[in-house]
Amino acid sequence: MSLLDFSMYSIYARIRFKELRFTTKVSMSEIKSILSFTGWNVFGSFAYMLKNQGSAIVLNSFFGTAINAAFGISNQVMAAIKNFSINLITAFRPQLVEAYARGDYSRTTKMFYSMTKVTYIFLFAISLPLICEIEQVLKIWLGDYPDYAVSLTVLSIICMLFSNLNTPVAQMVLAIGKLKEFQIVTSLLICMIIPLSWICFHYGLNPNWIYIVSIIIVIVNQIANLIILRKIYNFEYFEYLKDAIMPCLYATILSPIV
């Protein structure tokens, strides 16, 4: 199946992009660039895996298996909602990459802002009723559910919404191809969740702080990643706030009222 996918993509690329040519020549600089790109992607994925596994271990060591089960439930709900975001990002990504590759930076910036607000508003529209009725949803799904399952699930959804704002930034960095600084900063910040949560639990705070710490780190990471993106791509912070973040803020404030 993978071979078929590769073949279809190759045929499409050959037809769509006339400048592409098959060649037997090996360019070491190109291979080095591809390996670097892949390596930093793997590095970032490893950091997220470490964060997820480490969080479960820390929770289990302080609060036992019941809270760990509640944490697992919250992760399942968050992953289910996040799948919708992945589908939307998949629809945006080819257009974003194509616009940047062609040097159409005006369209690239518009796609960046559109991806930010569309994915957030769509996810928020799904998340809001779920947050409001989470007890009923868990009761239908599980019957009896562990302590802290409700609060952990709500906080996981909120964390996912904040984290989703960073996904378009990541897609921009991927389109540009300069991943090193982005992945190092993101990975270090994400991994900080584990020791900071451990400190919170050591001083007697409840399990909800695993996600409260995560939300704080996600916000800090968003700011850091915007600074990194600004170094490699020309966009204005004010324009980003006005065209991407403010529509998300309006949707968040007005939706519960409506």
Where does each model-flagged region fall?
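Hydrophobic alpha-helical transmembrane segments
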Residues: 1-16, 37, 187-192, 206-228, ...
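Alpha-helical transmembrane segments of polytopic membrane transporters and translocases
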Residues: 4, 39-42, 55-57, 69-89, ...
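Interhelical loop/hinge segments that connect adjacent transmembrane helices in multipass membrane
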Residues: 7-52, 91, 95-110, 231-246
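Membrane-interface "helix-start" segments
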Residues: 29-40, 119, 152, 214-258
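Interfacial/gating helices of multi-pass transporter permease domains
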Residues: 30-41, 58-79, 103, 107-111, ...
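Helix-loop junctions and terminal segments of transmembrane helices
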Residues: 74, 78-116, 170-175
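Interfacial segments at transmembrane-helix termini and the short loops linking adjacent helices
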Residues: 113, 121, 131-161, 233
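Membrane-interface junctions at transmembrane-helix termini in multi-pass inner-membrane proteins
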Residues: 157-189, 231-233
